[in-house]
Amino acid sequence: KGSPFDGKYKGGWNARTKAELAELSGKIDETHRYGYFYGGLVDELNKAYGKTVIKTVPLYYGQALLRAQIIDGKVPGVKKQSELYSDAMGHVSELGQRLNAYTVFAAIYGESPVGLHVPQWEKSGDTVLRAQGLSLQKAAWVAVQAVPVALERKDY
């Protein structure tokens, strides 16, 4: 059914539109780092050390990207945004845990998780689950590439 609490937008996790998701995710450019203050803080610290010593993992942005795909009906086996969460407080479900794991992998290794096989998340012959995993992997990689402080930079 979805969460009864979803910030200033009423109606549960499924109430968000793609425009609202974009507003929540923040702009991603050189002047407005991922819509929150940590991006600027990470840049400051990395510049102070002259190299990348801290990176961020854009879990929320990956979730926002996946939610937009769910709205468009492009995530196999997933019908509602609320399937990404396990409760009204925004804790992630198994689906969200998989997305977060791929996002962490991409941020740590600086490599795309697309095509990564995780046996415990795959069932032999389950093409929907495999296609769903591919959607999660792609969202994770797009999120990590889009957030400048998620990848190692050479310009400090």
Tell what function each PLM region has.
Residues 1-6, 61-66, 91, 107:
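Solvent-exposed loop/turn segments at secondary-structure junctions
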Residues 8-61, 80-98, 129-133:
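Substrate-gating cap/lid alpha-helix
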Residues 28, 60-67, 140-143:
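Generic hydrophobic, helix-prone segments enriched in Leu/Val/Ile
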